[in-house]
């Protein structure tokens, strides 16, 4: 390879120059005049003739040294020197024609001096250009070393041309002992590098500049644990900050989940103190999730609004580092409510597709289920003078297949029993039992709903299961209530309950067997609804009753407004003029009395 050949040539020249130097140091230098025939010498010889002669006269031994170094610097010198003796012309010509010749290694002392002074500056760039052209053809493994050497060479070239006192045996031969570095460039810059690299210092002026930024932390993520804690404590001068952080870290340590690292967000330490203050001011983590207040929290923390997952990141970091502390100190929520809020937030997009009639669980608004704008209590016409008992239907729950599930919750007994003093106390007991059963069934349904929400089932399946379970519980409670009433009252009760999928209505028919004080009632809750009631009132009149349709004897009749047949009854004239008879009230979706 070319590089190896150049290195071997340089080594040979150094050895020969050293031998010649030892031999010439014993001979005194002759300063004869230069013959005019040496016109083919290097054109740079006439640049400094006076200074060259002065230096040659003063420092003969040092000139010989420079000659050796100059011979290494340009092996292909075109001609001799004016200072050489006349007899050395033939030797120069012979040396120039010899292949593999080391160059000007055997020239006279005068020639050596001029060669050094005149051609060091001119030939050195040529030699470097040749070396750079050779390096371009080398392998990639050697290119890395060459690149480093080129940087060193450029730095050395910035020191200026070699001066008279910059060369010596201590500079030449120590470089000889390092051949792998000697093949780059000529010997002069290598000699300079051996002396001046440790001196002035900037062997790699750009290297220090590149290393310095790496020592500086690029962002807060490279900080150590102690630095992060220090930054967290020193974010502002609020005296409550240190107190809060000490209390937080102590609590987490006692809890068994010590804070081993400080969360980083947007390349800065996440301010746990301000995050806790902002969230608790909004009502706690559950309220922030439900009301979607994360944008305000982000602005309060002075975080960039361009963060795409700011809400998720803040929520997870708060849950990890601050939520246990919030539950312990403030008690704004509990983990079950937090999980329900997270699940609700995830289902929000899909929940809108079910419509507004979809059942939604609300711990504080469970009684809202017991009202229905479709079936007002006044339309049933069952309110009596004493207790105003009524049947309050709950809203229909829409399942996946859009089938309506009627759920009837008896808030009170469906029939006024004020006209039966014998069974009034028993009726009150049955009413209390019915209310307790309804409350218990509602609580059980809500508890099961909470469990369903915390499970991993799809929202549609959860809603269907909740609806089925609540319907089953309510139907069972209704049947038990009516059966208990049948055991106490002299009535015959028939309960028709069909499956919800059949879309048929449930009817409750009560037929009294009490003789003159008989009760005939028919109630149909869902679908087309109607009811007929005819019974005698006590002597005291009530203004809530409808006007009497009969004469002074007080009589009334009820007919089915829906065309399904009616129950008709008459009461005797025991009441006299003061007695009033409650007429039947027919109610339907299409017609009202």
UniProtKB/Swiss-Prot annotation:
List the PANTHER family hit by this protein, alphabetically: AT-RICH INTERACTIVE DOMAIN-CONTAINING PROTEIN 3A (PTHR15348:SF1), AT-RICH INTERACTIVE DOMAIN-CONTAINING PROTEIN ARID DOMAIN- CONTAINING PROTEIN DEAD RINGER PROTEIN B-CELL REGULATOR OF IGH TRANSCRIPTION BRIGHT (PTHR15348)
Organism field: Homo sapiens (Human)
According to the UniProt record, list the residues that bear Phosphoserine.
77, 81, 88, 101, 119, 353, 362
Q: Where do the record's region annotations for Disordered lie?
A: 14-222, 497-516, 539-593
Q: Where is the composition biased (Gly residues)?
A: 549-576
Assembly description? Homodimer. Heterodimer with ARID3B. Interacts with E2F1. Interacts with GTF2I and BTK.
Q: Where is the composition biased (Low complexity)?
A: 54-87, 580-593
Query: What is the recorded function of this protein according to its Swiss-Prot or TrEMBL entry?
Result: Transcription factor which may be involved in the control of cell cycle progression by the RB1/E2F1 pathway and in B-cell differentiation.
Classification lineage: Eukaryota, Metazoa, Chordata, Craniata, Vertebrata
Effect listed in the UniProt record for changing residue 532 to A = Impairs DNA-binding
Q: Where are the annotated segments for Important for nuclear localization? A: 445-488
Which portions of the sequence form the region Important for cytoplasmic localization? 537-557
Q: Provide the alphabetized UniProt keywords.
A: Cytoplasm, DNA-binding, Isopeptide bond, Nucleus, Phosphoprotein, Transcription, Transcription regulation, Ubl conjugation
Which SUPFAM superfamilies does the record match to this protein? ARID-like (SSF46774)
**Acidic residues composition-biased segments:** 128-158
Q: What tissue specificity does the UniProt entry give?
A: Widely expressed, with highest expression in skeletal muscle, thalamus, and colon.
GO molecular function annotations of the record: chromatin binding; DNA binding; identical protein binding; transcription coregulator activity
Q: What is the effect of changing residue 534 to A?
A: Impairs DNA-binding
Residues covered by the ARID domain: 238-330
Q: What induces it?
A: By p53/TP53 following DNA damage.
Q: What is this protein called?
A: AT-rich interactive domain-containing protein 3A
Find the cross-link Glycyl lysine isopeptide (Lys-Gly) (interchain with G-Cter in SUMO2).
Answer: 398-399, 452, 462
- Keyword NAD set for record: no
Region Homodimerization, as annotated, extends over 490-513
């Amino acid at each position: 390879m070319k590089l190896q050949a150049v290195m071997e040539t340089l080594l040979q020249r150094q050895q020969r120059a050293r031998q010649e130097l030892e031999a010439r140091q014993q001979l005194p230098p002759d300063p004869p005049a230069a013959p005019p025939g040496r016109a083919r010498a290097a054109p740079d010889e006439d640049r400094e003739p006076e200074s060259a002669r002065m230096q040659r006269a003063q420092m003969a031994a040092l000139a010989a040294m420079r000659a050796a170094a100059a011979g290494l610097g340009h092996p292909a010198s075109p001609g001799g020197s004016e200072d050489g003796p006349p007899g050395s012309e033939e030797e120069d010509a012979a040396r120039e024609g010899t292949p593999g010749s080391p160059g000007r290694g055997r020239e006279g002392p005068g020639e050596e001096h001029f060669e050094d002074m005149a051609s060091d500056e001119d030939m050195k760039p040529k030699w470097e250009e040749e070396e750079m052209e050779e390096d371009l053809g080398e392998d990639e493994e050697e290119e890395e070393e060459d690149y480093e050497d080129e940087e060193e060479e450029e730095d050395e070239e910035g020191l200026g041309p070699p001066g008279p006192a910059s060369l010596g045996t201590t500079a030449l031969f120590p470089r000889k002992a390092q051949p792998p570095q000697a093949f780059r460039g000529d010997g002069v810059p290598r000699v300079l590098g051996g002396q001046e690299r440790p001196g002035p210092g900037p062997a790699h002026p750009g290297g220090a500049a590149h290393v310095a930024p790496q020592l500086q932390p690029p962002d807060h993520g490279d900080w150590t644990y102690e630095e992060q804690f220090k930054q967290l404590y020193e974010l502002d001068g609020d005296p409550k900050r240190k107190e809060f952080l000490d209390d937080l870290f102590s609590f987490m340590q006692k809890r068994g989940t010590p804070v081993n690292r400080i969360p980083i967000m947007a390349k800065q330490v996440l301010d746990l103190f301000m995050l806790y203050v902002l969230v608790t001011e909004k009502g706690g983590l559950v309220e922030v999730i439900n009301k979607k207040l994360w944008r305000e929290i982000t602005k309060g923390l002075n975080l960039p609004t361009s963060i795409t997952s700011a809400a998720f990141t803040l929520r997870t970091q708060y849950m990890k580092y601050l939520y246990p502390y919030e539950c312990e100190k403030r008690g704004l929520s509990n983990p079950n409510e937090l999980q329900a809020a997270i699940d609700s937030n995830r289902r929000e997009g899909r929940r809108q597709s079910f419509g507004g009639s979809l059942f939604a669980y609300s711990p504080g608004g469970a009684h809202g289920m017991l009202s229905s704008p479709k079936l007002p209590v006044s339309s049933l016409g069952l309110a009596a003078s004493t207790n105003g008992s009524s049947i309050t239907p709950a809203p229909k729950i829409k399942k996946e297949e859009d089938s309506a599930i009627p759920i009837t919750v008896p808030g009170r007994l469906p029939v006024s029993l004020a006209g039966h003093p014998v069974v009034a106390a028993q009726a009150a007991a049955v009413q209390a039992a019915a209310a307790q059963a309804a409350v218990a069934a509602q609580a059980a349904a809500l508890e099961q709903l909470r469990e369903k929400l915390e499970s991993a089932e799809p929202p549609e399946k959860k809603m269907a299961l909740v609806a089925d379970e609540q319907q089953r519980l309510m139907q069972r409670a209704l049947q038990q209530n009516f059966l208990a009433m049948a055991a106490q009252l002299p009535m015959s009760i028939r309960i028709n309950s069909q499956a919800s999928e059949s879309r048929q209505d449930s009817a409750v028919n009560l037929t009294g067997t009490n003789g003159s004080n008989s009760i005939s009632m028919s109630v149909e809750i869902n679908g087309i609804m109607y009811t007929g009631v005819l019974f005698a009132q006590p002597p005291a009149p009530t203004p809530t009753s409808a006007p009497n349709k009969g004469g002074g004897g007080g009589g009334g009749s009820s007919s089915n407004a829906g065309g399904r047949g009616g129950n008709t009854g008459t009461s005797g004239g025991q009441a006299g003029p003061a007695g009033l008879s409650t007429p039947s009230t027919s109610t339907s979706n299409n017609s009202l009395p």
